[in-house]
């Protein structure tokens, strides 16, 4: 069996957070592959070449309604790439419960609602799910306590999903980007900090992250399941330091 063969049919794909920079790039990559794509987002559509459906991932009824509309438009569902989420910065000692719960409601519970809804629609024919998290769920960064907890929780959930859904031919993986260009790093100081911390000496391009998301839903990744794939230039596994130079 050749697992590197191209996809034999047009896949029917849903991208949540598709109006954002990364989600929009993922949609472009899926369309280039030949997929039929629907965009789900809380914000207005950014493009007219795919159907767009309003969704609030913090509301279960909204998620179910959006998926019903999208799967009706696509006439089925093969692929879910969940890229919806929010990020806020607050030092641990200043973080209050309301802010923490708000991030969990969107990032963790939102991912649960979306993934469970999609999984139920995939039970008969199988499917491929990619949940977009962040390397913040794997490393400690100042001010990201609630965000890191929410994203780390999604990764743990995905592993259990992979274990439970494999018998239904549903693969579940996690994509954990590091710092990404394309309008996602408006603070030049923050951007430079990530560049300095990254062994690759730069941040990721949107297309690089979208390419990995697309790969994880391809036939070539048919034996990849329950994994967290970091797209971060090595920052989560390689620590940069300047080796002292001995005086001459």
Which functions belong to the PLM regions below?
Residues 91-92, 99-101, 194:
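Substrate-binding pocket helix/loop in short-chain dehydrogenase/reductase
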Residues 93, 139-145, 167, 201, ...:
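Active-site loop immediately N-terminal to the catalytic Tyr-X3-Lys motif
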């Amino acid at each position: 069996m050749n697992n590197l063969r191209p996809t034999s049919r047009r896949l029917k794909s849903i991208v949540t957070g598709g109006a954002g920079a990364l989600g929009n790039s993922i949609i472009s990559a899926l369309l280039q592959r030949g997929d039929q794509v629907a965009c789900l987002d809380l914000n207005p559509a950014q493009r007219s070449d795919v159907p767009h459906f309003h969704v609030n991932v913090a509301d279960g009824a909204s998620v179910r309604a959006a998926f019903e509309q999208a799967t009706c438009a696509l006439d089925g569902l093969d692929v879910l790439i969940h890229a919806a989420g929010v990020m806020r910065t607050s030092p641990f000692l200043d973080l209050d419960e309301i802010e923490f719960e708000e991030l969990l409601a969107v990032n963790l519970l939102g991912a649960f609602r979306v993934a469970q809804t999609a999984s139920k629609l995939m039970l008969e024919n199988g499917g491929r799910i990619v949940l977009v998290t962040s390397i913040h769920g794997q490393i400690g960064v100042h001010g990201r306590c609630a965000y890191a907890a929410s994203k780390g929780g999604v990764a743990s959930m995905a592993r259990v999903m992979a274990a439970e859904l494999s018998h239904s031919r549903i693969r579940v993986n996690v994509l954990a980007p590091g710092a990404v260009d394309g309008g996602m790093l408006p603070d030049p100081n923050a951007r430079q900090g990530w560049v300095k911390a990254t062994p690759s000496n730069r941040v990721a391009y949107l297309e690089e992250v979208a390419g990995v998301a697309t790969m994880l839903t391809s036939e070539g990744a048919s034996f990849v399941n329950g994994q967290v794939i970091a797209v971060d230039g090595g920052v989560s596994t390689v620590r940069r330091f300047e080796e002292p130079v001995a005086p001459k």
